[in-house]
Every structure is written in structure tokens, then in C-alpha cells.
Amino acid sequence: MKLELERPRQCANYSLAVCVLASGSRGNAIYISDGPTSILVDAGLSGTEIKRRLTSRGLSPQDLDAILVTHEHSDHIQSVGVLSRQLKLPVYLSRKIEKKASRRGPFYEIRTFQHGTPFQINNLVVHPFALPHDAADPMGFTITQNGRRIGLATDLGIVTPLVKEHLKDCHLLIIEANHDPDMLLNGPYPWPLKQRIQSRNGHLSNQQSQNLLMALQHSQLEHVILAHLSETNNAPQKALAELSKALTRCKPRLTVASQHHSGEVIYLK
């Protein structure tokens, strides 16, 4: 398998394209496409900003087919309703998330699912799985097309056996590396917030993510994107240094998703 970084109009015959539009506590959104079908995973920025970041990478908002929601926190659903109505997009989410996310509606169309039960958005096969986080029904996803598999798990406090099972054998991973424990402990956050972040329903530390990546590495893993980094309690170079230690059996490209600008479009052929 060959991985390339190019603009969409310059790349042909790919199985999956991925672009992290934003990642962090101020807003999250990920673009995934197989060409005929394009989706957003979360829409945690304003609709205007999401469309701007898409077009900055040569991606057309008009080509979107659906929005897939991980959970109902505002940094993941801020413009779900707006984009759904403007672009006439169905919104895929669980019933528990739907109840909590209704304040962002109305939605153009709602399609519900439950974790553990795979479903399809055209030719994209989506497998949702439960994550431990302080939300109504937080989800991770694997998305598969033509034998290529993307794994996505952010906003989780611990790595469960279920998480490892679903994320194994992916060709591209987007995983959380939220904080450095020492930076969090010595940082400005109030103690209750520090406790929440470190709890089993909080966010993964660099060390926890390192252990996860160590378990998931395999010869066909080509790209790892570190996501949801805290701007206060972590630093990109610190996260990269920690996570690179896990990669003893393979050498995927390891990058950090940004809060402030969209990443490159990554193609899996």
C-alpha cells in the first residue's frame, strides 16, 4: 500500500482520503472520502469555518453526503444542525446522542445507529464502538472501503480491550494524545478539572496513547495522527517524542492534528 499527500484534484484511484480539519477543545471535524462518498466526522467549528477549511484543501462542501457524530459535546457538534440544513445532509448518531444534541437542531434528516452494529454510508462501512468518556453515548469508529481501514478514537479516559480490538489492523489511526501528566498536574487548571481529565471518563495522556499505539502497531500501519492535544497541558513535540517511542516494529508517518488549521489530505491507495 502506498500513502501519498496531495491535493484531491491531483490524486486518482485512491481508496480513502482523510483530512483533519480541526482537533482540540475548541472544535473538532474530520473529512473522510472514498471519492463518490464524502462525510464529516463531527462538526465542532462554525459552519462557515468548516467550509473555509474544506475549500482551503480543495475539498467542496457541496460534495458532502453525511455527518457522523461521535458524541454531543459542543466542540464536536457546534454546526451539525446548520450544515445539515444548509447542505441537506443526513446526520448519523445514536439515539442517546440525539436526545442530547437536539439543541443544535433541527437536522435535515436523522439516521440512528447503536455501537457494536456496523452500517454503511453508500460504500463506506462504518463500525461504531463505545468509548469511556463523560458523555451520553461516546463513540469511536472504524471506516473501511476497498480493504483499507481508518480507526478513530478521541475523547476517552482509558483504553479498554474493546477499543484495542476495534482499532487493530488499521492502515491509518487518529488517536487521542491529550495531555502530559506533569504539565497537567503543575498547570493552571482547577483541581476538579484536573481530576476529570485524568479520570477513566476523561482524556488519554501521552503515556496512555503510547501504550495503545505500541499494542496496535503492525507492518501495514502507514499513518498515525495524534489528536485532541491540549494547548495548555501538552505540546506537539512532546507528544511526538513520547509516541514515537512506541513504534518499534513499524515506521508509519506520525503527525499532530492542529486546532488552528486543517491538515494535509492523506490518501490511502
Could you tell me what each predicted segment is?
Residues 2, 19-29, 70-80, 98, ...:
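Structured catalytic core of nucleotide-sugar glycosyltransferases
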Residues 22-23, 43-45, 72, 131-134, ...:
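Active-site metal-binding loops of divalent metal-dependent hydrolases
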Residues 47-93:
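Active-site metal-binding motif and surrounding structural segment of the metallo-beta-lactamase
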Residues 74-77, 98-100, 135-136, 159-161, ...:
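Active-site environment of divalent metal-dependent phosphoester hydrolases
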